[in-house]
Amino acid sequence: MSSSSIEDIKGKSHRLRGSLLESLANPTTGALRESDQTLIKYHGSYQQDDRDLREERRRQKLEPAYQFMIRTRTPGGVITPQQWLQLDAIATRYANHSLRVTTRQAFQFHGVIKRELKTTMQAINAALIDTLAACGDVNRNVQVAANPLISRAHADLYTDAAHLSEHLLPNTRAYYEIWLDEKKVAGAGEEEEPIYGPHYLPRKFKIGFAAPPINDVDVFANDLGFIAVIVDKTLLGYNVTIGGGMGTTHGDPDTWPRIGNIIGFITRADLITISTAIVTTQRDFGNRTLRKRARFKYTIDDRGLDCIVGEIQQRAGITLQPARPFVFEHNGDRYGWIEGEDGHWHLTLLLPAGRIADTEGSTLLSGFREIAQLGIGEFRMTPNQNVVIAGISPGQRAAIDALVTQYGLDTGNRAPTALARHAMACVALPTCGLAMAEAERYLPDFNAKLQPILEKYGLAETPILLRISGCPNGCSRPYLAEIALVGKAPGRYNLMLGGDQRGQRLNTLYRENITETEILAALEPLLGRYQQKRLPSEGFGDFLHRTGIIALPPYPTHRHVISSTLQA
C-alpha cells in the first residue's frame, strides 16, 4: 500500500476507529477490510495468514487461513506472576498454545482467529495489560534495561520509562470503544491528539532505556534512546540518542540501517519535555510521501543533525548539556542467579528465539506456569528474548531451582555453545507476511550446523553474537550482530559480518544471497583465523575489523560506529 493511501486511511479513520466494528462483525470472511488492516495495527494486532497453508488453500479455492497476531504493550517487559498465568491461559485458549517474547520485551499471541479477536483482547485487558499502540505509526513498546545489578537506580529507570510510555499513548478512545465496549459520548466529536495529530507519525517510533555497563536494549538501534547516568547509585539523568533504526530494503541504496547519534545529556525532570519535542519534530518533519524513507533516521540524514537538534531544543525550551561519560561492556544477558543491591536475587533463563511452548523435548510453558503459581517475585522479559525471574528472597530460591531442574528451564547454562546463548531470531515464517526466508524455525538447525565448526577450532564457549532475520526489516536487530543472516529468498540469506558485542557498530555485507552450505563455507576459514590470531578477550567482530577482513561500509561514520570519545 502506498504512503499516500496509508496517510489517507489514518486521516479519515475518525481517530483509529475506521470501520473496524463492521469488519469484525462480518461473518463471511476471516479477514478485515483493507483499510481496517492498517488501523488494527494501532490497536496492537496484525492480520496474517498461515503461509504454510497458502498453496493448499488456493488449490481448494479457499481464502487464506487468516489469523491475527496480538502484541502487548508492556514497558520494560515487566509482569506479575498472576499476569503471567493469565497470559498463559489466553495463549492456550485462543492462540497457538505458545507465548512469544519479542526483542522489544512485549508478548505476542499468534493464531488468533477473527471471531475470537475481541474476546482475546478483553482477556488481555482483564489481566491489566493492554495492546494499544503496540504496532502502527506511533511510539511502540518502550524498552528498559533488564539489568538487576543496580536495583535502586533500575527502579527509577523503569518508572521513567513507564511514565513516558503512558505519556506517548494516543489520546483516542477508539481502543476502549471497540474492544472494551466503552460508550462513545454523544456529540463529543473526535478527540484531540496533541502529540500525534490527525495523521499520527509518518512511521513507527521506538524508544529504549539502557543502563551501562550493559546495553541489552541495543539503545543505538532506537529512534530515541536514553543512556542512564548513574552516580553513587543515584540516577541523575540520561544521555540522549536519536536516529537509530534497523530497517532497510534489499538492493535499495536509498535505505540503510543506522545507529543513533548522542546529542547531549538531560536530567530526569526534562525527560517528558525532550521526548515530546523529539516525537513532534519527527511528526512534522518526517517524510509522509515515501514510506520507505519515513523513519526518523532519514529525517535526520535529509535535514542534517544540527538542524534537527536545534529544532528539538527550540520546541523543548531546553539546551542539552554535554553528554556524560559512559561505558558499555556488552549487550547480552547474564544467565543464572545474580544478587541485587537489596539482597534479592534475579534468575535469568534462556528462551530460544523467545518462544515459550510445550513441544517434543521441551516443557517451557508448563515450567514457567508452575513457577508463576508460586506467586513470588515478578517476571521481566529481556531485549534478548529471555526472561528474568526477579525479586526473589534467598529463602525462595530453592523452590524455583527445583522447578527449573524439573522442567529443564536452565538451558542458558546447559546450551551446547556460547553461540546458542547469544543468538536471536525474528518470527518470520509461517506467520509474518514480510518474511522472505525462515528465521525462528531455522535458528536451532543453523546452530547445530555451525556447532561442529566452533568445536573444531575450540570456540564452543567463545561468545559470538548471531542474529537471523527473515527479511531486511531487521526485527531481530541483525545489523548489530557479529554474524547475521538476513533473509533474501527461501533458503537464501545475505551474510552480514562485523558488528560488535556492545551494540555500537553496524556490520556489513560479506556475501549476498547465499545458501546454508555457502554460509558455512564462508564462515569456517574466518573462524579458524579468529582462533589462531585473536587478541585476548577480542570479539569476533572486532577481530574481523582489526585484521582488515571486514571494512566499514561506504556510509558516513554516524551510520555505523559510535565514537569512543564519550567512553569513560
From Swiss-Prot:
It is an enzyme of class 1 (oxidoreductase). Keywords: 4Fe-4S, Amino-acid biosynthesis, Cysteine biosynthesis, Heme, Iron, Iron-sulfur, Metal-binding, NADP, Oxidoreductase. The keyword Flavoprotein does not apply. Gene3D superfamilies: Sulfite Reductase Hemoprotein, domain 1. [4Fe-4S] cluster binds at C426, C432, C471, C475. It catalyses: hydrogen sulfide + 3 NADP(+) + 3 H2O = sulfite + 3 NADPH + 4 H(+). Pathway: Sulfur metabolism; hydrogen sulfide biosynthesis; hydrogen sulfide from sulfite (NADPH route): step 1/1. One of its GO terms (cellular component) is sulfite reductase complex (NADPH). Its EC number is 1.8.1.2. Its cofactor is siroheme; [4Fe-4S] cluster. Siroheme binds at C475. The keyword Acyltransferase does not apply. One of its GO terms (biological process) is cysteine biosynthetic process. PROSITE patterns: NIR_SIR. GO terms for molecular function: 4 iron, 4 sulfur cluster binding; heme binding; metal ion binding; NADP binding; sulfite reductase (ferredoxin) activity; sulfite reductase (NADPH) activity. Binds 1 siroheme per subunit. Belongs to the nitrite and sulfite reductase 4Fe-4S domain family. Component of the sulfite reductase complex that catalyzes the 6-electron reduction of sulfite to sulfide. This is one of several activities required for the biosynthesis of L-cysteine from sulfate. HAMAP family: CysI (MF_01540). Alpha(8)-beta(8). The alpha component is a flavoprotein, the beta component is a hemoprotein. This is Sulfite reductase [NADPH] hemoprotein beta-component. It comes from Xylella fastidiosa (strain M12).
